């Protein structure tokens, strides 16, 4: 059952092969049996089964949409009424939200059943899911490896068959990189496509929610429910609703050859994504995927994104600056952790934040406060914003000669748990191929395309697909065509 797609699971519900309650119970048992992965931080079977019973009633009355009765896990950065909403931090360890994030509310309105909240890097700051106050998540493909971050709990849950789908967020690669490391499909939509209301903020000009699942087709179904204008989010885009499944299974160009469904598609390959630093085994998997695309009729076109290397310093000025501002609200007074002993109000602020935040969050708050301080704002923050604009312009120049851009989602496969904990810069470098996409506000996704080599033979590789603004439906079409021709996305870790 856990290997079925969302469409297949819904067909099973419609055929009465199982009920929503039975489906939820199936996944709850799997979650309980896989506690060692540490993918979930909060599960409440009573709440889950109550939602499943409501879904069964809707299905019986013929009132259900295409997602009704299907289980989903939510990254613990989305506030969720009834479940704790911690953002992976001691600061919010016991926080109970009085409302649902828009993403949660929309998926619940579509009839989806919440299985629980998934583990994550604290306040979404990390690339390995080792920065969680609740301990690291293990990669189901190789439990000595990280699952990626910050949406590592979500990627591990989908890969291990603990949930058929999960929500994630992506600020600098936090959907795409863990999707790559765990061998699942994940998409970061265009900035503003998915509401940030109720999504605990890290960097407001970068944060974007998106779906994670086994396939592009499943992600398209989820995005149909998640995307759309929300007046409660000032950055939400006012655009007509779309059906993100509308191009799936169709030829790229009208009248195209069924044997060459992607004839006419131009794939841009940035030279900067295939240079020094890209592991040989990752390069081999990406090259093989590109050959599959050529066999499907696509044409490979060289392009250049010359400011790719600058995306790391630019991101690590802008994101910490915004985090410094956003996290100032956690002071121990209004909500969040409060120190047990303190002398006065200022001491309470200091101790509450010192005790509540982990090392990586403190590091980024300090960096952000520094770059926003008097005398440094112009030299760092404003300069970073200027280069950010140039990075976005570079993408637009590249898109003049191609329809989508492809390359690796990460320069390496997943590394061992603890391998980079003492060197944050090496951790930051792992996001070299995803950061610029976030800085430009473009949509990007990762699809499974193979595995590493040698000692890394059990560790997945993800192909990154980057589209122009609002091109999610076409990107999903391109990913879906690849997945119809390959089986990387349906492979499962041993023992699952």
Swiss-Prot record:
Q: Which UniProt keywords apply?
A: ATP-binding, Ligase, Nucleotide-binding, Protein biosynthesis
Q: What GO cellular component is one of the record's annotations?
A: glutamyl-tRNA(Gln) amidotransferase complex
GO terms for MF: ATP binding; glutaminyl-tRNA synthase (glutamine-hydrolyzing) activity
Q: Which InterPro entries match?
A: Amidase, Amidase_CS, Amidase_dom, AS_sf, GatA
Question: So what does this thing catalyse?
Answer: L-glutamyl-tRNA(Gln) + L-glutamine + ATP + H2O = L-glutaminyl-tRNA(Gln) + L-glutamate + ADP + phosphate + H(+)
The highest taxon in the source lineage is Bacteria
Q: Catalytic center at which residues? A: 75 (charge relay system), 150 (charge relay system), 174 (acyl-ester intermediate)
The EC code for this enzyme is 6.3.5.7
Main enzyme class: ligase
GO-annotated biological processes: translation
Quaternary structure, per UniProt, is: Heterotrimer of A, B and C subunits.
Q: Which PANTHER family match?
A: GLUTAMYL-TRNA(GLN) AMIDOTRANSFERASE SUBUNIT A, TRANSAMIDASE
Purpose of the protein: Allows the formation of correctly charged Gln-tRNA(Gln) through the transamidation of misacylated Glu-tRNA(Gln) in organisms which lack glutaminyl-tRNA synthetase. The reaction takes place in the presence of glutamine and ATP through an activated gamma-phospho-Glu-tRNA(Gln).
Family to which the UniProt record says this protein belongs: Belongs to the amidase family. GatA subfamily.
**Name this protein carries in UniProt:** Glutamyl-tRNA(Gln) amidotransferase subunit A
From which organism does this entry originate?
A: Burkholderia pseudomallei (strain 668)
């Amino acid at each position: 059952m856990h290997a079925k797609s969302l469409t297949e699971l819904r067909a099973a519900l419609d055929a009465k092969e199982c009920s929503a309650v039975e489906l939820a119970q199936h996944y709850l048992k799997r979650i309980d049996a896989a506690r060692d992965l540490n993918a979930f931080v909060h599960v409440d079977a009573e709440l889950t089964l109550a939602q499943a019973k409501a879904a069964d009633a809707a299905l019986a009355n013929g009132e259900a949409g295409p997602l009704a009765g299907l289980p989903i896990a939510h990254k613990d950065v989305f506030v969720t009424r009834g479940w704790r909403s911690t953002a992976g931090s001691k600061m919010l360890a016991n926080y109970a939200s009085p409302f649902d994030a828009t993403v949660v509310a929309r998926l619940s309105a579509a009839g989806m059943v919440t299985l629980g909240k998934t583990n994550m890097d604290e306040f979404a700051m990390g690339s390995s899911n080792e920065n969680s106050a609740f301990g690291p998540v293990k990669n189901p493909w190789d439990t000595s490896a990280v699952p990626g971050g910050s949406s590592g709990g979500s990627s591990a849950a989908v890969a291990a068959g603990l949930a058929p789908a999960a929500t994630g967020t992506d600020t600098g690669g936090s959907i795409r990189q863990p999707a790559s490391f765990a061998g699942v499909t994940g998409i970061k939509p265009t900035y503003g496509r998915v509401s940030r209301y109720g999504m605990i903020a890290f960097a407001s000009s970068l944060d974007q929610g998106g779906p994670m699942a086994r396939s592009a087709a499943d992600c398209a179904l989820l995005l149909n429910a998640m995307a759309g204008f929300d007046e409660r989010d000032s950055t939400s885009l006012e655009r007509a609703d779309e059906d993100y499944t509308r191009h799936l299974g169709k030829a790229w160009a009208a009248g195209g050859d069924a044997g060459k469904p992607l004839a006419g598609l131009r794939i841009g390959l940035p030279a900067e994504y295939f240079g020094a630093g890209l592991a040989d085994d990752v390069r081999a998997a990406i090259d093989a995927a590109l050959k599959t695309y050529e066999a499907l009729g696509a044409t490979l076109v060289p392009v250049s994104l010359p400011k790719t290397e600058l995306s790391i310093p630019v991101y690590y000025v802008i994101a910490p600056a915004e985090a410094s501002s956003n996290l100032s609200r956690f002071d121990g007074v209004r909500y969040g952790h409060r120190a047990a002993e303190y002398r006065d109000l200022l001491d309470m602020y200091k101790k509450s934040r010192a005790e509540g935040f982990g090392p990586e969050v403190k590091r980024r708050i300090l960096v952000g406060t520094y770059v926003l301080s008097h005398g440094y704002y112009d030299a760092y923050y404003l300069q970073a914003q200027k280069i950010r604009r140039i990075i976005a312009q570079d993408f637009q120049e590249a898109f003049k000669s191609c329809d989508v851009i492809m390359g690796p989602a990460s320069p390496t496969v997943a590394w061992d748990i603890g391998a980079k904990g003492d060197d944050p810069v090496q951790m930051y470098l792992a996001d070299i191929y995803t950061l610029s996409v976030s800085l430009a506000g473009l949509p990007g996704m990762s699809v499974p395309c193979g595995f590493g080599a040698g000692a890394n033979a059990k560790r997945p590789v993800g192909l990154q697909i980057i589209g122009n603004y609002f091109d999610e439906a076409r990107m999903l079409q391109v990913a879906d065509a690849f997945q119809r021709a390959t089986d990387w996305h349906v492979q499962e870790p041993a023992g699952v």
